[in-house]
């Protein structure tokens, strides 16, 4: 009874918040708010610098591989488990997925900085 009451309260509250969001007026977007502010002077140039898409892709690839390496860090402690065969199988599976991802990035020229 208590769980169903909590669930119903959550659903009703979520629906109420969604309905209120639809009824609220849209805010006006002012162009002055999106321009750069330089101490009261007119901006000398665009504040939005062009961003290298190649750098972004290399950074995302680094983050993904770094996360996968972080998943391998507990392996020395996991080797003390009773089911060593399963642990080694899962570790080799993770390493092979990591190697396959690296090979794919390399074959797609995702690691080369040339443009």
Swiss-Prot record:
InterPro entries in the cross-refs: NADH_UbQ/plastoQ_OxRdtase_su3, NDAH_ubi_oxred_su3_sf
Instruction: Provide the reaction this enzyme catalyses.
Output: a ubiquinone + NADH + 5 H(+)(in) = a ubiquinol + NAD(+) + 4 H(+)(out)
Localisation: Mitochondrion inner membrane
For this UniProt record, the keywords arranged alphabetically read as follows: Electron transport, Membrane, Mitochondrion, Mitochondrion inner membrane, NAD, Respiratory chain, Translocase, Transmembrane, Transmembrane helix, Transport, Ubiquinone
Looking up Pfam families in the UniProt record yields: Oxidored_q4
Annotated transmembrane regions: 5-25, 55-75, 86-106
According to its UniProt record, where is this protein mainly located? mitochondrion
Q: Does the keyword Transport apply?
A: yes
E.C. number(s) listed in UniProt: 7.1.1.2
Question: According to Swiss-Prot or TrEMBL, what is its membrane topology?
Answer: Multi-pass membrane protein
- Share what the entry says about its subunit structure, partners included: Core subunit of respiratory chain NADH dehydrogenase (Complex I) which is composed of 45 different subunits. Interacts with TMEM186. Interacts with TMEM242.
Q: What does this protein do?
A: Core subunit of the mitochondrial membrane respiratory chain NADH dehydrogenase (Complex I) which catalyzes electron transfer from NADH through the respiratory chain, using ubiquinone as an electron acceptor. Essential for the catalytic activity of complex I.
Name used for this protein in its record = NADH-ubiquinone oxidoreductase chain 3
What lineage is on file?
Answer: Eukaryota, Metazoa, Chordata, Craniata, Vertebrata
């Amino acid at each position: 009874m208590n769980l169903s009451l909590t669930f119903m309260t959550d659903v009703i509250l979520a629906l109420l918040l969604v309905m209120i969001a639809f009824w609220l007026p849209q805010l006006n977007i002012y162009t002055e708010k999106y321009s750069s502010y330089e101490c009261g002077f007119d901006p000398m140039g665009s504040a939005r610098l062009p961003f290298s898409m190649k750098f972004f892709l290399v950074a995302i690839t680094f983050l993904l591989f770094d996360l996968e390496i972080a998943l391998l860090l507990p392996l020395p402690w996991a080797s003390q488990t009773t089911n060593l065969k399963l642990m080694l199988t899962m570790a080799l599976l993770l390493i092979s997925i990591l190697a396959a991802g690296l090979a794919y990035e390399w074959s797609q020229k995702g690691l080369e900085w040339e443009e």
